[in-house]
Design a protein with these regions (language model features):
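Membrane-embedded alpha-helical bundles that constitute the cytochrome b-like, heme-associated redox core
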Residues: 1-174
Length: 174
């Protein structure tokens, strides 16, 4: 898993540096934060696909048994993405970086100017709660119904991430 993450991020960085025109090339830190986000999104997509794929073919059963590890790895990558975003885009001002992230763009009434960062933060909070409660101990403490409801919120988080990526891409093309 670790090797796969390293290869994915390395390939993303290499492709980003080699294939983009020099006039519009992103900085290496921007490529790194995008690579961490893209790798996290790919892992989450894989995690969501593993259940149905394991029913179709026994080849996917090893991934099903290791899904918890995939989820924790994906949340760590998403946290790294968020930390790099805060450091690069909001870490060099007098304002607290978290306040800057959430308050710098209040245009919630416009699709073109919507602060897509808030969608990513909301998804990250849900996914962090899921990762923190993924151990069987929390299933006992929370009860099966509450634990299941919390972990079914992954689909809402996935929708938030898709909206975060789409709005970020659209707004980044300006």
């Amino acid at each position: 898993l670790f090797l796969g993450v390293v290869v994915f991020i390395g390939a993303y960085l290499g492709a980003g540096l080699m294939l983009s025109p020099s006039s519009g090339r992103a900085l290496p830190i921007q490529l790194a934060l995008r690579a961490a986000g893209a790798c996290a999104f790919a892992l989450l997509t894989l995690v969501l696909l593993v259940g149905p794929l394991a029913r179709l073919s026994p080849l996917f059963l090893p991934l099903l048994y290791n899904r918890r590890l995939l989820c924790v790895t994906f949340v760590l990558l998403a946290l790294a993405h968020g930390a790099l975003v805060i450091l690069w885009y909001h870490g060099f001002s007098d304002l607290n970086p978290l306040v800057s992230l959430l308050a710098s763009n209040p245009r919630y009434d416009s699709i073109q100017g919507f602060p897509f960062e808030s969608l990513g933060v909301a998804a990250l909070l849900v996914l962090f709660l899921m990762a923190a409660t993924s151990h069987d101990f929390w299933n006992t403490i929370l009860g099966p119904n509450m634990w299941k409801a919390l972990h079914m919120s992954v689909y809402w988080a996935y929708a938030l991430i898709v909206a975060h990526v789409m709005l970020g891409a659209v707004q980044g093309e300006k």
